[in-house]
């Protein structure tokens, strides 16, 4: 009696970006909000949005939003850098074949000018993480008026 073995090779569902920023610049205005959108496909487990490492910008060092497959931000607010607490939000829509993640930074300041990154982690433990970076350029300035002659406080000029 002959025995036959059938070897079935299934290619893993690799993940990829469909709309990478590829380190391009996006302009945000002081006092306004800016939203970054990434579209992707494959077996993506988590989507992480964060600050690019200043020494090696291809790495994300400060996590701002951490979205699970169920669109739940599982990052404890206490882990978000102080300067960003209460000013960031993220959502994830779609399924394993095609998804989108949107991240919003509210009340932009000049200090927000830097690289931000989106990191996709695969469902497959043997899969590779991929990331994409975007540079936020901030425009606008504050003008401080004389309190005696022109009113109170600072006024935003954009």
Task: Annotate the PLM regions.
Residues 34, 112-120:
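Conserved Ig-like domain signature around the intradomain disulfide
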Residues 35-41:
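Short edge beta-strand/loop segments characteristic of extracellular beta-sandwich folds
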Residues 73-111, 122-124:
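Extracellular beta-strand/loop-rich beta-sandwich domains predominantly from IgSF
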């Amino acid at each position: 009696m002959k025995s036959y073995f059938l070897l079935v090779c299934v290619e893993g569902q690799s993940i990829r970006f469909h709309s990478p920023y590829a380190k391009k610049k996006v302009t945000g205005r002081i006092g306004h909000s800016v939203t970054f959108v990434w579209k992707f496909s494959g077996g993506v487990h988590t989507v992480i949005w964060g600050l690019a490492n200043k020494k090696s910008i291809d790495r994300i060092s400060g996590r701002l939003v951490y979205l699970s497959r169920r669109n739940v931000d599982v990052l404890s607010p206490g882990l978000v850098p102080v300067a960003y607490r209460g000013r960031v939000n993220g959502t994830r829509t779609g399924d394993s074949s095609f998804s989108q993640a949107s991240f919003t930074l509210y009340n932009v300041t000049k200090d927000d000018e830097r690289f931000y990154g989106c990191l996709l982690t695969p469902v497959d433990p043997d899969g590779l993480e991929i990331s994409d970076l975007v540079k936020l350029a901030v425009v606008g300035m504050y003008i401080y008026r004389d309190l005696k002659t022109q009113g109170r406080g600072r006024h935003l000029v954009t």
